[in-house]
Structure formats: C-alpha cells, structure tokens
C-alpha cells in the first residue's frame, strides 16, 4: 500500500490514484502529519530539505515558519512510517522542501520511498527509489543503453 501527500494537480493526483489501485490500496494524506518531538537527524534533514526547496521563504519570520513546518512534517512522516513500515511513501519529485522531508522521514523509519516524475517519453511516468532527473537511479550515459541493445539483435532499432 502506498501513502502519498495530497496533490492539488489533477494529473499528479490521477497518477497516485492509479498507482494505489495497482498496489492494492493507498492512503492519501489530506493534511501533513506533524510532530514536534525531534529525532537526532531532524535538524540535518530540515536543513537539507530546505536547501533544495523551490519556494524559499522571504525574511527571518518566513524562514523560521518554514523550518518549523518542515521539521514537523519530517518528524510526523517518520513517526507515521515507524507505525506503518509496510507502506511505501510516494511523492512527486521529492527532492526539496516538504516532499523531501516526507520521503526522508519514511526512509529513516525503514520504509520504502519512491519519487514520481514525468518520464522522458510521452504519456509515461517515472517511479524511482533514488530520485529524479540527474539524481535518478537511471543510468545517465549512453554506454549502458548501447551495451544493453547490443546483447540482443532485436533491440537495435532506428
């Protein structure tokens, strides 16, 4: 069963709904899980998540509030996945901000985590346990693909 934060984008929500159906069910988190009892790794995870956040807070108050929110989300996700280690955390992109804190909380609790993203092929989605784009688990260089294609004559195409 997958667990994923609610998305306010119909396409992303449809991807998670379909994935949940294939995986035998899903738990959509309408609101972020929050906990303010820290783990030893909390501060480092918050700093890492915020350093990559798309929307950086403006001013000291905004930064403090964002740190507080991401801290609560990391701790909340970690506690949730400690209680549900059989669930798989899935988030769109998940390299920065709240989604990164969610996925890292799951990983630190021992649960599996997947990053979802549009694939380089039309109409396809990538699910990757490592990351997305240049940080994905997909080989980046052409050597892997040419070696793979060379192993079977039917794999060489136009």
Locations of the language-model features?
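An aromatic- and histidine-rich active-site surface loop
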Residues: 95-104
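A general secondary-structure boundary signal
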Residues: 1, 105-108
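Conserved catalytic-core segments centered on acid/base and nucleophilic motifs
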Residues: 89, 103-106
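Active-site proximal beta-strand in glycosyltransferases
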Residues: 107-123
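Short N-terminal targeting/anchoring amphipathic segment
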Residues: 80-96
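Conserved N-terminal ligand/cofactor-binding loop architecture of enzyme catalytic domains
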Residues: 1-78, 82-83, 118-158
């Amino acid at each position: 069963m997958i667990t994923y934060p609610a998305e306010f984008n119909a396409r992303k929500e449809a991807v998670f709904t379909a994935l949940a159906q294939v995986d035998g069910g899903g738990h959509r988190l309408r609101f972020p899980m929050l906990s303010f009892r820290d783990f030893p790794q909390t501060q480092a995870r918050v700093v890492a998540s915020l350093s990559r956040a798309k929307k950086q807070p403006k001013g000291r108050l905004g930064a403090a509030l964002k740190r507080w929110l991401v801290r609560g989300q990391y701790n909340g996700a970690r506690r949730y996945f400690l209680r549900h280690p059989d669930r798989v955390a899935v988030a769109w992109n998940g390299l920065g901000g709240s989604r990164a804190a969610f996925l890292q909380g799951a990983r630190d609790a021992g649960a599996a985590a997947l990053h979802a993203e549009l694939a380089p092929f039309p109409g396809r989605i990538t699910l990757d346990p490592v990351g997305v784009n240049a940080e994905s688990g997909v080989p980046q260089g052409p050597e892997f693909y040419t070696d793979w294609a060379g192993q079977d004559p039917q794999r060489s195409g136009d």
